[in-house]
């Protein structure tokens, strides 16, 4: 009997081992099918991506591949046939650099896929993303190389003039940006097609677009190409509202913030008003030596966006630490912080922005954290440590989060979803308390 039991046990083990191997085989087959399915889905996604982004993707990838082959030099210094996009030279480059072109395509696909997931996650959490879009393209860019007809180039594809700003109290020789200028007549003849494509694409990446140098659509400053300063530039007429009427017709739900900082003419103010786009108000600009600045909060209307400071400003703490004399005295008077520490003044300015009538308030995270200029994002017209500051996971404490949320709630700026969640949480807490009270009453009885 014992031997029979041993035999049965051995057979059972063999059977179990066989079943286990079968299970492993089935699992391996299932995993292989899943891998093939994922690969097929990715291939379909990739093909769809190439189709969706065809307006710019091929030109960009070809440009990058050629630029890499040309050791990174600006395209206006490429061999003539490539610089001028001769058909034969372009076809040869596409053939010879096919592998590198495919690398840049797939790189853009990976980024776009990841970005879309990130944006979808943010939107699901009730967070909208504002994208910052410069008015001009860079000279050394695929946009300029692939679309020379929309820019002010001569017959050799060199710029006739470049962008910048005239001399003022801050710069005796002005600002020489060096971007090629648009040929607005040519763009209008094409129905502003490139701008329609650009803004459509931007609004796929972002929920709201902030257009830099909005006044440049009314008048733009043109500096002769090759000049070392901006002193010989002159103002030229831009497209004005004609461009924005076209964009409004072609693009559904066009959400724009107009960067309208600096000196503005009456025609620029009229264009901003007619467009209906909100302009910008920067609190740091309100305390500039006078007590009558248009950036003071009591002068705002609803249709604007208030910032304590932008990426181009000092942090609010750094700005306060560098402020002196009358301006420092006035800002402390304005926010009712006469002797308080600088961090208290930072929070008072945050409250000033949030309590204003501006429809939208933007507070840099550096200000919520009361960081100094070691955390400044960008110092315009300088080289060095710009755009290197990073927020780390351990910098935001639960206490800071609580204060951020409370000050947002107090001034009625909580997102609707957050308000509803808070209301539900309060209602649930009240219901739990009522049930506890009922239970206690029964116990007493």
Where are the language model's segments positioned?
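Intrinsically disordered, low-complexity terminal tails and inter-domain linkers enriched
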Residues: 420-444
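Structured C-terminal cap/extension of enzyme domains
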Residues: 370-421, 445
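Alpha-amylase-like alpha-glycosidases and glucanotransferases acting on alpha-linked glucans and related
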Residues: 17, 21-109, 137-362, 366-373, ...
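Conserved, well-ordered alpha-helix/loop/beta-strand core segments that scaffold catalytic motifs
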Residues: 104, 108-137
């Amino acid at each position: 009997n014992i031997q029979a039991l041993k035999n049965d046990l051995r057979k059972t083990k063999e059977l179990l081992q066989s079943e286990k191997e079968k299970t492993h085989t089935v699992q391996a087959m299932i995993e292989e099918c899943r891998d093939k399915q994922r690969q097929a889905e990715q291939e379909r996604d990739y093909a769809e991506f190439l189709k969706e982004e065809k307006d710019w993707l091929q030109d960009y990838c070809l440009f990058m591949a050629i630029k890499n082959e040309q050791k990174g030099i600006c395209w206006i210094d490429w061999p003539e046939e490539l610089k001028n996009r001769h058909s034969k030279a372009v076809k040869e480059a596409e053939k010879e650099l096919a592998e590198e072109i495919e690398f840049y395509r797939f790189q853009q696909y990976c980024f776009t896929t990841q970005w879309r997931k990130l944006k979808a996650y943010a939107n699901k959490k009730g967070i909208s993303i504002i994208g910052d879009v410069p008015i001009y393209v860079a000279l050394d860019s695929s946009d300029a190389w692939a679309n020379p007809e929309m820019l002010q180039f001569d017959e050799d594809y060199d710029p006739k003039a470049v962008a910048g700003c005239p001399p003022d109290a801050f710069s005796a020789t002005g600002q020489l940006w060096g971007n090629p200028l648009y040929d607005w007549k040519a763009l209008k003849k094409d129905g502003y097609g490139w701008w329609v494509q650009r803004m459509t694409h931007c609004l796929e990446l972002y929920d709201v677009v902030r257009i830099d140098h909005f006044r440049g659509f009314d008048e733009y400053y043109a500096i002769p190409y090759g000049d070392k300063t901006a002193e010989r530039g002159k103002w030229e007429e831009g497209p004005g509202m004609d461009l924005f009427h076209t964009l409004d017709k072609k693009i559904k739900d066009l959400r724009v913030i107009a960067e309208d900082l600096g000196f503005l003419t009456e025609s620029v103010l009229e264009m901003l008003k007619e467009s209906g786009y909100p302009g910008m108000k920067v609190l740091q600009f309100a305390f500039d030596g006078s007590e009558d600045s248009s950036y003071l909060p009591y002068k705002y209307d609803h249709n604007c966006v208030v910032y304590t400071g932008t990426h181009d400003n000092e942090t609010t703490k750094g700005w306060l630490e560098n402020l002196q004399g009358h301006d420092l005295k006035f800002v402390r008077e304005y926010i009712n912080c006469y002797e308080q520490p600088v961090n208290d003044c930072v929070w008072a300015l945050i409250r000033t922005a949030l309590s204003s009538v501006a429809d939208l308030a933007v507070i840099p995270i550096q200000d919520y954290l009361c960081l100094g200029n070691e955390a400044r994002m960008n110092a315009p017209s300088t080289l060095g440590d710009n755009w290197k500051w990073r927020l780390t996971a351990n910098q935001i404490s639960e206490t800071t989060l609580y204060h951020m949320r409370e000050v947002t709630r107090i001034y009625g700026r909580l997102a609707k979803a957050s308000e509803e969640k808070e209301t539900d949480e309060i209602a649930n807490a009240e219901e739990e308390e009522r049930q506890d009270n009922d239970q206690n009453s029964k116990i007493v009885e």
